[in-house]
Amino acid sequence: MARVTVEDAVNQIGNRFDMILVAARRARQIAVQGKDPMVEEENDKPTVIALREIELGLVTADTLDADERQTVREREAAEIAAVAAIAEGRNAI
């Protein structure tokens, strides 16, 4: 079982409340969205991995925000391309 002290993570983020929000967002990315961990997994749960990433300075609220904005842009571009393909198909008929 991994033991993680959160003091380093708190120091990286600024306060424990924001650290919890950042860790939860990152753990959700790893567990649900299938994002790859930036540290060795070592059979740890996503929450522990998220805390280790925060401790090392690999994850901040800003990096998570930027990643989410990029994901939204990619999703919107895919939707626009799909609509354009459908419209072209209708025009060809």
UniProtKB/Swiss-Prot annotation:
One of its GO terms (molecular function) is DNA binding. It comes from the Bacteria. InterPro entries: DNA-dir_RNA_pol_omega, Pol_omega/Rpo6/RPB6, RPB6/omega-like_sf. Pfam families: RNA_pol_Rpb6. It is an enzyme of class 2 (transferase). It catalyses: RNA(n) + a ribonucleoside 5'-triphosphate = RNA(n+1) + diphosphate. Coiled coil: none annotated. Its EC number is 2.7.7.6. Gene3D superfamilies: 3.90.940.10. Keywords: DNA-directed RNA polymerase, Nucleotidyltransferase, Transcription, Transferase. One of its GO terms (biological process) is DNA-templated transcription. SMART domains: RNA_pol_Rpb6. The keyword Transferase applies. GO terms for cellular component: DNA-directed RNA polymerase complex. The RNAP catalytic core consists of 2 alpha, 1 beta, 1 beta' and 1 omega subunit. When a sigma factor is associated with the core the holoenzyme is formed, which can initiate transcription. HAMAP family: RNApol_bact_RpoZ. Belongs to the RNA polymerase subunit omega family. Promotes RNA polymerase assembly. Latches the N- and C-terminal regions of the beta' subunit thereby facilitating its interaction with the beta and alpha subunits. This is DNA-directed RNA polymerase subunit omega. The gene is rpoZ.
